[in-house]
Amino acid sequence: MANLIKVHGSQNSFFILDQTKLKTALTDDQLRKLAQHLTNHQTGLLGGADGLLVVNKPTRPGALAQMRVINADGSEASMCGNGLRTVARYLAERDQKKSFKVDTMDASLQVRREKDFAPDVPAFAVEISPVRFNKEALPFDNLGHDRLLGTPVPELAPQLTFSAIAIPNPHLISFVSQKVIEGPLLGELGPYLNGDNPYFSDGVNVNFAHIIGPNRLFVRTYERGVGFTNACGTGISATSLAFVLLHGDQGAFDEPITVYNPGGMVKTVVHYQDRRYWVELVGNATFTHHIKVEEADLHQASVNAENCTITATGEQAAYEQFIRHLPKFNLSQRN
């Protein structure tokens, strides 16, 4: 038998598959088909998910393991901050370690166990890097600028300013009013910039942020390859960096920032060290279900409730209790 774990960070949900425990690793095509099968919100297992997190042997010296991120549409993301926290917890428990590095597509990133947010709400801190601002890194074009940092971009939305940051996933960020973050614009701009458009040829994650107060934000994200998600760890990290750079009177380097999102909350700390930016992302790493399945069913992307054994952990109830009194927005325009 093989194992899957249903997990979430700020209710950005995933299945974890540890390929090092399989007799035969899945091919890239099999991983893509499995991700599309498991994560479908209509027909997938346990109501679907936002992606599949694949654990492999490390590819760089000094790392404990490698994490790959397969989106719900079968595309591969270079990183996932919320997913990395859950993989960090899995590896910490698998190998009995508290601090270590995990390989991602672009870098080996430091992770560590943190104090629980609440009873049965375990938390992990993960490094989010590298950071790039140049248009080739995202990429974008035809916007009249080589970089966007609080820049008016009338081609996208005449009334807003935008920042573009690859961290390493590409993110477009705008600080907006509560009315705008609750309204339909993000649900229009996100699909447009992730379809055939003249500006972002590879698509882009689009983040709207509302400043609640000093060191307090609310962030809503339309994710490339997924759509609206409850939270996006790299999006929150990129938004926190833009917040410190553009709104220094409200947030500062090396100070904790509380970031609320539709799925809960996280904390970030923005750093500038050795002439490089990086962000520390701290949040929950919740396991909701353990799943036992025949390895052949993984290879054939035929996992369903009838051919696997599912055990709930009880951690979701603790998480829901934790977020019960957090600030909430009326996000009625969810697409």
Predicted regions and their residues:
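A glycine-rich beta-to-alpha transition motif near the start of alpha/beta enzyme domains, typified by
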Residues: 1-121, 173-335
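Transmembrane helix-loop-helix hairpins in multi-pass inner-membrane proteins
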Residues: 123-125, 131
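Active-site glycine-rich loop that binds ribose-phosphate moieties when present
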Residues: 133-135, 139-160
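Flexible, active-site-adjacent loop/turn segments at secondary-structure boundaries
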Residues: 136-138, 165, 204, 291
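Internal active-site segments that recognize and position negatively charged phosphoryl groups
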Residues: 151-182
